[in-house]
């Protein structure tokens, strides 16, 4: 099983998860051309895709969805609320409704040899979800765009072998930054985005011996830095009430606009 961030940041997100036989993208919030280039770097093309899992309808998650769907007739998996919003978005171009596949929170579905299990998240979108994807007993979690987490979130993300988790902003950078007040409040709110520190606190509750890799994703260009995100999360893990140190795990920050190193989950 492989996990690879093709791009992850507040300006565009596209994550690859696959096995030898099945190839999925989680979101296409970048251009179709860039998504294809990312697939090419993995030895794949758009024709190899078995599905696109959409977390929610914001443009940094769906900008290239229409292009990829039309060119390759790839099935699109999303919640009812998200699919309804996508169909209203004129800037994506027409997408054949026959490609739409409805998913429901906490209801598993099978795409060839992968099992997909959507999970609820708290974000200001119609019906947003994160995804847990399993190949046999190996599991990957993709969880970004959540303003808060709770016991449900923790239970959903326990037992992952690899996890891509949001570390969107440094609170101090956001507070003194150029964003207008209403936008700062949105980001800091319960339906906004997870800060570096809260990302680390969430991780402290789900770490386990068999966790192979942690990828910090969806960093804000204006309100975060890769080194800040990494260090804040590292400190939360090391100083938190858990038996681990950050150095016990492979941890990286996903690149905003370039393909990140591939994580092979064995």
Task: Describe the role of every protein-language-model region.
Residues 1-42, 129-145, 162:
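Conserved beta-strand hairpin/beta-sheet module of binuclear metal-dependent hydrolase folds
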Residues 26-29, 50-57, 77-80, 141-144, ...:
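Active-site neighborhood of phospho(di)ester-bond hydrolases with catalytic His/Asp-centered motifs
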Residues 33-79:
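Active-site metal-binding motif and surrounding structural segment of the metallo-beta-lactamase
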Residues 59-61, 83-85, 126, 148-151, ...:
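Active-site environment of divalent metal-dependent phosphoester hydrolases
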Residues 63-72, 87-90, 224-231:
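Metal-dependent catalytic neighborhoods of phosphoester/phosphodiester hydrolases
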Residues 80-130, 135-137:
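Metallo-beta-lactamase
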Residues 151-252:
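Cap/insert and terminal regions of metallo-dependent hydrolase folds
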Residues 249-266:
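Short, basic/aromatic-enriched C-terminal tail that caps enzymatic domains
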